[in-house]
Amino acid sequence: MPYVKSNKIKLYYEETGKGYPIIFVHEFGSDLREWEQQVRHFSREYKCITFNARGYPPSEVPEDAKQYGYKHSVDDIANLMKELKINNAHIIGLSMGAYAALLFGLKYKKMAKSLVIAGVGSGAMPQHRKGFFSMANELADEFIKKGSKKVASIISNSGSRIQLKNKDLRGWLEFKKHLEEHSNIGSALTMQQYQALRPSLMDFENEFKRMNIPVLLAVGDEDELCLEINIYLKRHFLKLNE
């Protein structure tokens, strides 16, 4: 299995195709397998790199809470690219991965050719902060007490996932199965140290105003916790090549 090291943590990755590189950064509820259809398509013309975040086997699962958090996730993208000798790439992130990808664009500007930011920003708006943090910590406790298999049933039937079940049952079953296979400890610490502690995207207003990387924001029309912050980002922060 191919691995790279990021601050001493082993990250599993897969590389498919040849051409200009695209780095895919997965969401909390999934792993690199969620990008299968995208890799099948884009690897015809691009080099596609997917990887599992720290805490997601077969990547290393540290038991030290200090080894988790959004700053580590941003640096993990950069360290993966450095290990693979990639100077810059298109970066595509979903949800939690979109948060890391967007902040990667702030910290490592020269390494990002463009950013595709999908479903970013849960809990970013002031009225959502308290409820989001409470939910994140409750889910972390559930992973420890009940395990990934039972929590997968809760998450896969939540409001933001139910349309996948309605429209693509096979895809939904695959999502649920993958989530059941995740590490209890890795998922809990990711939720506690990354999701529950990450700053609001609104805190980066000045940095976003200076961003000159092409950014595509994408959000589902029923992704209620992300709609408002994406509109806010478009109007106030990101120039989006205007």
Regions found by a protein language model. Give the residues of each.
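Catalytic histidine neighborhood in serine/cysteine hydrolases
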Residues: 234-242
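Short beta-strand/loop motif that positions the catalytic acidic residue
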Residues: 211, 217-219
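Active-site loop/oxyanion-hole signature of alpha/beta-hydrolase fold enzymes
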Residues: 39-40, 49-92, 96
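Flexible "cap/lid" loop of the alpha/beta hydrolase fold
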Residues: 106-107, 112-146
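Conserved alpha/beta-hydrolase "acid-adjacent" motif
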Residues: 224-229
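Serine-hydrolase catalytic-loop signature spanning alpha/beta hydrolases and amidase-signature enzymes
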Residues: 27-37, 48
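Conserved alpha/beta-hydrolase catalytic His-Asp/Glu region
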Residues: 127-131, 146-207
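Active-site glycine-rich loops that stabilize anionic/oxyanionic intermediates
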Residues: 19, 27-30, 95
